[in-house]
Amino acid sequence: MYYIGIDLGTSAVKLLLMQGDGQIANIVSREYPIAFPHPGWSEQNPADWWDAVCAGIPELLNGFDASQVAGIGAGGQMHGLVVLDAQDKVIRPCILWNDGRTQKQVEYLNNVIGKENLSKYTANIAFAGFTAPKLLWMRDTEPENFTKISKIMLPKDYINYKLTGVHCTDYSDASGMLLLDVQHKCWSKEMLDICGVSEAKMPKLFESWEAVGTLTAEAAAKLGLPEGVKVCAGAGDNAAAAVGCGAVGNGKCNISLGTSGTVFITSSTFGVDKQNALHSFDHADGGYHLMGCILSAASCNKWWMEDILNTQDFGKEQEPITAEKLGANDVYYLPYLMGERSPHNDPAARGSFIGLRMDSTRADMTQAVLEGVAFAIKDCVEIARAQGVEIASSTLCGGGAKSPLWREIMANILGIPLALPQTEQGPGYGGAMLAAVACGEYATVQECADKLIKIKSVTEPDPALVKKYAARYELWHKLYPTLKPLYAEMEALQ
């Protein structure tokens, strides 16, 4: 049997066809636009996602027996607010995870409602990208649209709705809304009341591997699939990527270098970071996880290469960064191009190059970008370690993980071995794995991961470089608090 995995990303949907034994039979990608109607805003039209899926799946199945497809599972960009009216029509464009317009609402939630109360209700505090502040923004700024809301969902849930006609979500994705009681796996009445929405407007909750329904006749006809194909609830992209990299069960870590960057630490028991600098979410395997998220990771390198250096030859730009330059770069980079989430929770934060001199080179700045992202990931790792969480090794996924140089820099800055899974399709592969569990191909997510996940290579840290980078990190770590007062002034002048 075949299983379709959907990776609903920020810039494109990636679709993969997985055999029951885990082999990837085909991969297709379809891009769609992203709109920035105002500085700091970020939106997409949900219809563009669905159109991309409808165009991509027939292409994915070309040359394969569609009758052998048993299930579909999606991993999707988290936190985006999708709102439907009583006729299930989209009311307004989706406000995405990297949208920073909700600073006022975040301040209200954290300072008026209070971080302690938020943590009690949801195990988390408010961040600009979360869904609840977006609902408050709609209520404050677009009251006519807010009153039309009949259903609230997340990006991948809209795809599942179009596939099955069911309004649903899973616990891992719902955890990032600031509307879910993460510990008890139910909607928080307190948060729904604060946001002015009833539970009837919220999607039904499922475990990620549970089937939410089967394809409707209309969806099956559009996709060229039989109506009996099961659709599982799927997961938020980070949880799906963790499944696709084998980070399931207790005490595993997965680091993702995608558009954003994440540190994902699994646990069989519920726990909250004392400072709420890390997210405490449900995992797609039925357990829990702590997660740190930096808003700009591989997107920093893409911005630097394509927008500033006007090149797409990433490998050539990295060639001058030789071994002796590692741990010896005097140029530092703060990767806050979209503000920052973990650990600073500061939508006003800005990206910066610091330490430039007349003899600084293009390669120094390229190296600084790679190192700055790794230092920001280390910020999250160190917070987890301070809570007593042991992180002895990690898997690594995402577009940035394809760079051997970046893997080497990351391993030495973090001081741990980094394992690269055989498949590079983390969220999509995880989605297909969850679909395989939903269809009974595997009994549990753990069994599926144990049988399917293979490691391609491991990057080991060099003790001498670990020591050099530790000193550089201590200096880098002081830069944000030094510049923080200026970010608010920059915001005021905008």
Feature roles, as predicted:
Residues 200:
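A conserved beta-strand/loop element that lines the FAD pocket in flavoprotein oxidoreductases
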Residues 30-32, 207, 283, 461:
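Active-site donor-binding loop signature of nucleotide-sugar glycosyltransferases
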Residues 1-92, 120, 148, 220-221, ...:
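N-terminal glycine/serine-rich phosphate-binding loop of ATP-dependent small-molecule kinases
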Residues 4-5, 103, 110-127, 133-168, ...:
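Active-site core segments that coordinate phosphate-bearing ligands/cofactors
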Residues 22, 45, 72, 99, ...:
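Residue-level signal for inorganic ion chemistry
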Residues 26-30, 203, 457:
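Structural signal for short hydrophobic segments within the conserved structured cores
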Residues 58-97, 125-131, 160-181, 204-207, ...:
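Short beta-strand-loop/turn "lid" adjacent to the catalytic site in phosphate-handling enzymes
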